[in-house]
From Swiss-Prot:
GO terms for biological process: histidyl-tRNA aminoacylation; L-histidine biosynthetic process. Heteromultimer composed of HisG and HisZ subunits. SUPFAM superfamilies: Class II aaRS and biotin synthetases. GO terms for molecular function: catalytic activity, acting on a protein; histidine-tRNA ligase activity; transferase activity. Belongs to the class-II aminoacyl-tRNA synthetase family. HisZ subfamily. It holds the Pfam family HisZ-like. It comes from Bacillus subtilis (strain 168). It is found in: Cytoplasm. This function is generally fulfilled by the C-terminal part of HisG, which is missing in some bacteria such as this one. Keywords: Amino-acid biosynthesis, Cytoplasm, Histidine biosynthesis. Required for the first step of histidine biosynthesis. May allow the feedback regulation of ATP phosphoribosyltransferase activity by histidine. Pathway: Amino-acid biosynthesis; L-histidine biosynthesis; L-histidine from 5-phospho-alpha-D-ribose 1-diphosphate: step 1/9. GO terms for cellular component: cytoplasm. This is ATP phosphoribosyltransferase regulatory subunit.
Length: 391
């Protein structure tokens, strides 16, 4: 019946899954908090002309609506734009790098046949006002630490750079615009299409080989040496030097086992201007998080500042962890009128110990056997006696 249907892409979170999400969220936010990031919240609704326009999310994925004054609003499609707005208007006045954390739901319209959620929770950080490679390394190292703290044992962070493909394309094709088709193939990870398109271009065999070699630039620090062989410009060499410096810092953090370079990475997040990355878990075929440097975004809010950050998807992380819904850890105290005072006192004592306790009047239960199956332990205060039943 229609009354039980939900809008396309919207999902209910039942108690068991809610507890699982809470546990995973806390494991991430606890570590982020220890790294000195301060958490904040922003409105669910933002103006389209500010946050909506500057969002990296594609236009057709924005949820739009009108307010009473006829202004177009959007449900926030990500948290980077809203935090950039707040930083530009209120926080950057402090004059030092900002470290901001968040745990929030974001909204992206989905195709009906896609089966993807249109609302999902992200936990992440933004480091604003620090343009150094140390800042890039910090957020990547924080991702590694947060995922380990959540219990994820096997994962890789693929690190790329927005400038490496652009530098090569400019050298070979003359400008970035002529490379739009190649960039689309890389974004879609359609490497067969990329190869076929390169072969069709009116280029020398040497230049075609350079474009094709881009697909092979994956691995450890040795990838930087191979990248230097296919880029000649100062811009390209500078990107390689930046990646080398990043790797050195990640070695100091002790997290290079969880990272690899992927220099043909292209993100749909068009505002990325430098180092960018995606997080993959073993046996999971989708990205569970991503991030990177976006030095131009704050300028759109009249407060130019370098920035980097990341966002992790709670739902995908739960799937990567192969977590089942959290088992019930709630106890019940069932009482009759004769022992109501004793039952209330007992329940309060247990709650003071940190236990979760439901206090239930016997007269309000239709099927006591069915109800007690929902609790870990049940204590009865009925008539003149007290009885305990362990789940």
């Amino acid at each position: 019946m229609f009354m039980f249907e939900k809008p396309h892409g919207m999902r209910d979170t039942l108690p068991g899954l809610y507890e699982t999400k809470k546990k995973v969220r806390r494991s991430l936010t606890d570590l982020i908090d220890k790294w000195g990031y301060q958490f904040m919240e922003t409105p669910t609704l933002e103006f389209y002309d500010t946050v909506g326009v500057q969002s990296a999310i594609e236009e057709q994925q924005l949820f739009k609506l009108l307010d009473q004054d006829g202004k177009t609003l959007v449900l926030r499609p990500d948290m980077t734009g809203p935090i950039a707005r707040v930083a530009a208007s209120k926080l950057l006045k402090h004059g030092h790098p900002l470290r901001v954390g968040y745990a929030a739901n974001v909204f992206r319209a989905q195709e009906r046949e896609g089966g993807r959620p249109a609302e999902f929770e992200q936990v992440g950080v933004e480091l604003i006002g620090d343009g150094t490679t140390s800042a890039d390394a910090e957020v990547i190292a924080l991702v590694v630490g947060a995922l380990k703290n959540a219990g994820l044992a096997s994962f890789k962070i693929a690190i790329g750079h927005a400038g490496i493909a652009d530098a090569l394309f400019v050298e070979v094709l003359g400008n970035v615009e002529r490379a739009d088709v190649l960039r689309r193939f890389l974004y879609e990870k359609n490497y067969v299409g990329y190869r076929e398109h390169v072969k069709s271009l009116p280029l020398s065999s040497i230049d075609k080989s350079r474009l094709l070699e881009l697909l092979e630039l994956r691995g450890g620090i040795e990838v930087c040496g191979r990248a230097e062989e296919i880029v000649d410009s100062a811009q390209g060499k500078s990107v390689v030097d930046e990646l080398k410096a990043l790797w050195d810092i990640l070695e100091d953090y002790g997290c290079t086992e969880n990272v690899r370079l992927d220099l043909n990475m292209v993100s749909h997040m068009s505002y990325y201007t430098g180092i960018l990355f995606e997080v993959y878990a073993e046996n999971v075929g989708f990205v569970i998080g991503s991030g990177g440097r976006y030095n131009k975004l704050l300028g759109h809010f009249d407060s130019p500042a370098p920035a980097t950050g990341f966002g992790l998807r709670i739902d995908r992380l739960i799937e990567a962890l192969h977590m089942k819904d959290e088992p019930c850890e709630i106890d019940a105290v069932i009482f009759s009128k004769e022992q109501r005072a004793q039952a209330i006192a007992y329940a309060n004592e247990e709650r003071m110990k940190g236990n979760k306790v439901v206090l239930q009047d016997l007269s309000g239960i239709e099927n006591i056997d069915q109800m007690t199956k929902s609790f870990a332990n049940v204590t009865y205060f009925i008539g003149a006696r007290k009885e305990e039943q362990n789940g």
